């Protein structure tokens, strides 16, 4: 059985979130939360919140045991990009892309054996 949680349109670039997400893939949920608490990245609290939401979904909706949960899948997709302009020299302007992310966390019970 799997439980998942998704957060959409987070104002952090997907490239930066993937650095954090790669640290917890395949880990037990307790270990994953500990890793996120000690990771000094802006995306860490956001990923931790999604992970806790997935754990709560597993417990409430599917009555899974929290102690046996493992982060099965976690991935980051690109959300809509906010396009902004920065004034430059001689009356020109450069485009600034403010990227957003969709973060998905899937937890499942650890298989015995």
UniProtKB/Swiss-Prot annotation:
Task: Provide one Gene Ontology cellular component.
Answer: cytosolic large ribosomal subunit
Any one of the GO BP annotations: translation
Q: Which InterPro entries match?
A: Ribosomal_uL22, Ribosomal_uL22_bac/chlpt-type, Ribosomal_uL22_bac/org-type, Ribosomal_uL22_CS, Ribosomal_uL22_sf
- GO terms assigned for molecular function: rRNA binding; structural constituent of ribosome
Q: List the disulfide bonds.
A: none
Q: Which Gene3D superfamilies match?
A: Ribosomal protein L22/L17
Q: SUPFAM superfamilies in the record, alphabetically?
A: Ribosomal protein L22
- HAMAP family in alphabetical order: Ribosomal_uL22_B (MF_01331_B)
Subunit structure, per the record? Part of the 50S ribosomal subunit.
Function, as annotated: This protein binds specifically to 23S rRNA; its binding is stimulated by other ribosomal proteins, e.g. L4, L17, and L20. It is important during the early stages of 50S assembly. It makes multiple contacts with different domains of the 23S rRNA in the assembled 50S subunit and ribosome.
Q: What is the protein name for this chain?
A: Large ribosomal subunit protein uL22
What organism is the protein native to?
Bacillus mycoides (strain KBAB4)
Q: What is the lineage of its organism?
A: Bacteria, Bacillati, Bacillota, Bacilli, Bacillales
């Amino acid at each position: 059985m799997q439980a998942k949680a998704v957060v959409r349109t987070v104002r952090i670039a997907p490239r930066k979130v993937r650095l954090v997400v790669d640290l917890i893939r395949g880990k037990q949920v307790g270990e994953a939360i500990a890793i996120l608490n000690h990771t000094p990245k802006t995306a860490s609290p956001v990923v931790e919140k999604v992970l806790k939401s997935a754990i709560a979904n597993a417990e409430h909706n599917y009555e899974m045991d929290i102690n046996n949960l493992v982060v099965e899948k976690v991935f980051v997709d690109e959300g809509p990009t906010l396009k902004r302009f920065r004034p430059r020299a001689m009356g020109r302007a450069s485009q600034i892309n403010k990227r957003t992310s969709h973060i998905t966390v899937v937890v499942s019970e650890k298989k015995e054996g």
